[in-house]
């Protein structure tokens, strides 16, 4: 299987998010890359499911909360941006202050 660089990046997000969810299920608080991976993955999947950019921007702030991440991580992530594939093409989703 030959994947384009963009497809490889998306696959890495999926793998990182899966690992992060497993750690979260064990009761561990998430670090920076784990938190970003989960939020990015959920946004990409929401786009694939047909949700709008506006809906995802709002929903993106509810995926994780401060209790889910290690101390100081929420402040390290002022925004998350991810290019996602929607039924009508690729669009950029920006979620400001995703961890509240």
Curated annotation (Swiss-Prot):
Entry EC no(s): 3.5.1.5
Subcellular location per the Swiss-Prot or TrEMBL entry: Cytoplasm
GO cellular component: cytoplasm
Transmembrane segments: none
GO terms assigned for molecular function: nickel cation binding; urease activity
Pathway: Nitrogen metabolism; urea degradation; CO(2) and NH(3) from urea (urease route): step 1/1
The entry's keywords: Cytoplasm, Hydrolase
Statement: the UniProt record of this protein carries the keyword Ion transport: no
Matching CDD domains: Urease_gamma
Quaternary structure note: Heterotrimer of UreA (gamma), UreB (beta) and UreC (alpha) subunits. Three heterotrimers associate to form the active enzyme.
PANTHER family with a match to the protein in the record: UREASE
Name this protein carries in UniProt: Urease subunit gamma
């Amino acid at each position: 299987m030959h994947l384009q660089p963009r497809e490889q990046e998306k696959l890495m997000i999926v793998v990182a998010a899966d690992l992060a969810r497993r750690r979260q299920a064990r009761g561990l608080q998430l670090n920076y890359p784990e938190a970003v991976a989960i939020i990015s993955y959920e946004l990409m999947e929401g786009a694939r499911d047909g949700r709008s950019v506006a809906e995802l921007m709002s929903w993106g702030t509810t995926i994780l909360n401060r209790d889910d991440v290690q101390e100081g991580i929420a402040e390290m992530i002022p925004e998350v941006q991810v290019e996602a594939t929607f039924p009508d093409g690729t669009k950029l989703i920006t979620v400001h202050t995703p961890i509240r």
